[in-house]
Amino acid sequence: MATIFDILNTHNNNNNFENCKRQCSTNKSNKTIIDILPSMDVTMTNDKLIIETELAGISKDHIEIDIKDSILTI
């Protein structure tokens, strides 16, 4: 499965959205990761990666964040 870094790197380097979608595996609802990926701002500093995204209509209490095997899940 592609990581968020792979997705961003592919999308930024060759700007080929379809190629990026093909790299992502599908989930149980047959949507690829990119189909459910909200727009986000990604900033990298020397010691951290900052990801900002809007999750309209979702309460802060209902947001879960998990990192496992280099995969960030929000």
Swiss-Prot record:
Cystine bridges: none
Signal sequence residues: none
Top-rank taxon: Eukaryota
InterPro entries xref list: A-crystallin/Hsp20_dom (IPR002068), HSP20-like_chaperone (IPR008978), HspG1-11-like (IPR051779)
Domain sHSP intervals: 31-74
Keywords (A to Z) from UniProt: Stress response
Assigned protein family: Belongs to the small heat shock protein (HSP20) family.
Protein name as catalogued: Small heat shock protein hspG10
